[in-house]
Every structure is written in C-alpha cells, then in structure tokens.
From Swiss-Prot:
Modified residues (Phosphothreonine): 63, 141, 165, 170, 172, 199, 217, 225
PANTHER family, A to Z: GLYCERALDEHYDE 3-PHOSPHATE DEHYDROGENASE, GLYCERALDEHYDE-3-PHOSPHATE DEHYDROGENASE
Protein's name according to its UniProt entry: Glyceraldehyde-3-phosphate dehydrogenase
Biological-process GO terms, alphabetical: glucose metabolic process; glycolytic process; innate immune response; microtubule cytoskeleton organization; neuron apoptotic process; peptidyl-cysteine S-trans-nitrosylation; positive regulation of canonical NF-kappaB signal transduction; positive regulation of type I interferon production
Residues with the Phosphoserine modification: 110, 136, 139, 229, 300
Activity regulation details: Glyceraldehyde-3-phosphate dehydrogenase activity is inhibited by fumarate, via the formation of S-(2-succinyl)cysteine residues.
Processing and modification events after translation: ISGylated.
Modified residue annotations for N6-malonyllysine: 182, 203
C-alpha cells in the first residue's frame, strides 16, 4: 500500500522519476486496477494502462519485476538508483541490502528498522551522510511526532512526555476476530473495536533527537476509521510557557524551516479533513490544552498513509 502511494506522491510532486516496480503477488492488469482505484484517496487523476509488458502512468513506461527474492531484481538494468523497500519484510540492513546486489545504489526502508540509520525529514535529515547506502524513514507516527517534539524541545525543553496515537486501521489488523500470535488484542475485529496497542514511535523519537532519548514513550489506540490518525503528546516543559507561546512557535516553524512538513491550523477540524494531506504532521491549535505553564497536552493530525509516503 505504501509503495502504491509513494508512486502516487511521486507523480503528484514530479520530484522523483519512477523507473521500475517489483510486485510478485499481482499481474500487470491488476496493478493498473489497484493503482487507478483507491477506496481511501479516490481515483488516480492521471492516466494508467498496461502496454508492452510495462505499467504506463501519465505516459511514463515503468519496468515491472515479479521477484520474491530481492537479490534477483535487476534494478540496475532498469536504471533504478534508489529503491523504496515497502514490503514490511526486508527491514534490516542485511535483508534490505539484497536490493544493492541487483544494482540499486541506495535503499530507503519505509518502516522502522532494527539496525538501519533512521531519518525523519525536518528533524535529523541534515545528519545524513552520503556514505550511507541503507536508511529507514521511520514510521508514520514517528514522522508526525518528531517534528512537533523538536519544535517544543528547541524552544521550551521537554523534561519528559507520554504520547498516545489514535490510529486508523492498517493492513496488519483483522477484519473479524482471528489469531494474532502473542498480541492477542491485535487479532480482534478492526471495524468493531477500539484496540489498545503498542508502538515504538515515541521511543524512536529518541533516536532522531538524541537529547530526548529515554524521555518519551507511548502507546496506540487502533480505532475503526480507514485513514488519518492523531497524536496526543502530553509533556512537562523545562521552561514555563503559556499555551499562546506554544502556538506561536509552532506556527512560525510551520511557515519557516518546517514548511510542508509541519502544518498548523486553528480551524475546527476532524480526521476526514486531513485525507490525502501531504504534511507529516498538522498541529491542531484549538484541540490542545494546558494544565499550567509547564504541563501541556498537544494535538497533531497526520494522514498516516499519504503524509508518510510524501516523506519517503
């Protein structure tokens, strides 16, 4: 799913040239159908067709591979330099490194990784070193939380914090109750329940903002909505600040260094208003509250599919 939406984002922005796609599970005609029609984001606004064994999007012919083993994909022959690894399976340096054997020069893992360096755009992307061949783009929740946490920490200091993400359904969940390994709750029907779940998103912020390492943790509630999630960051501030001061610095960041990554709104918004929004995170000024000048609850929305795909 993220692979398809990264492709949509690439054709929408025009910043990236898609030359090849690997999908061993569906044939070319099915690829056309799945790319063209999307239950959440609507029909693709351009043209898409199958022609001469290639997927043709907006007139651009894309080479198709159907390999289960990434070492067999001839990325180099197709002219691919950067590979987006979005299967959710090959997320370690060793496994993702298989793409390099086929001629790719770099691999971006669209998930958290146990050992690959992790980067969040707008937060620690400037630490990227050109010698790195394999990197992780973290998770959608980390890419929402980290820019907000950075702005707050840079201006007021975060002593400690707890994050809750109210998260839309994703493909790992069950349509009806079913077995789910050791995570029994995760196996309950996604459309019927609010499901408490674990997330490493808050702890991962400590990897991209080292000063916050050990200061944040969090959990998730999976809720029966198809897309768009929201982060609640409740934190203690080092430096006292009125809620108006917080709004001011977030707004400034959204118009300056984090423009396009961190959004800001004072409107009376709800989750559907962020469908297909390309920001990593949009601060909801009207939804947050302060207990006092050192203890605040901050709310930020994200399209967990499309916002994340635009950062990839």
């Amino acid at each position: 799913r993220i692979g398809r939406l990264v492709t949509r984002a690439a054709f929408t922005s025009g910043k990236v040239d898609i030359v090849a796609i690997n999908d061993p599970f569906i044939d070319l005609n099915y690829m056309v159908y799945m790319f063209q029609y999307d239950s959440t984001h609507g029909k693709f606004k351009g043209t898409v067709k199958a022609e001469n064994g290639k997927l043709v999007i907006n007139g651009k012919a894309i080479t198709i591979f159907q390999e289960r083993d990434p070492t067999n994909i001839k990325w180099g022959d197709a002219g691919a330099e950067y590979v987006v690894e979005s299967t959710g399976v090959f997320t370690t340096m060793e496994k993702a490194g298989a793409h390099l054997k086929g001629g790719a020069k770099r691999v971006i893992i669209s998930a958290p990784s146990a050992d690959a360096p992790m980067f969040v755009m707008g937060v620690n992307h400037d630490k990227y070193d050109n010698s790195l061949k394999i990197v992780s783009n973290a998770s959608c929740t980390t890419t929402c939380l980290a820019p907000l946490a950075k702005v707050i920490h840079d201006n007021f200091g975060i002593v400690k914090g707890l994050m809750t993400t109210v998260h839309a359904i994703t493909a790992t969940q069950k349509t009806v109750d079913g077995p789910s390994g050791k995570l029994w709750r995760d196996g309950r029907g996604a459309a019927q329940n609010i499901i408490p779940a674990s997330t490493g998103a808050a702890k991962a912020v400590g990897k991209v903002i080292p000063e916050l390492n050990g200061k944040l943790t969090g959990m998730a509630f999976r809720v029966p909505t198809p897309n768009v999630s929201v982060v609640d960051l409740t934190c203690r501030l080092e430096k006292a600040a009125k809620y108006e001061d917080i709004k001011k610095v977030v707004k400034q960041a959204s118009e300056g260094p984090l423009k396009g990554i961190l959004g800001y709104t004072e409107d009376q918004v709800v989750s559907c208003d962020f469908k297909s929004d390309s920001h990593s995170s949009t601060f909801d000024a009207g939804a947050g509250i302060a207990l006092n000048d050192n203890f605040v609850k901050l709310i930020s929305w994200y399209d967990n599919e499309f916002g994340y795909s635009n950062r990839v």
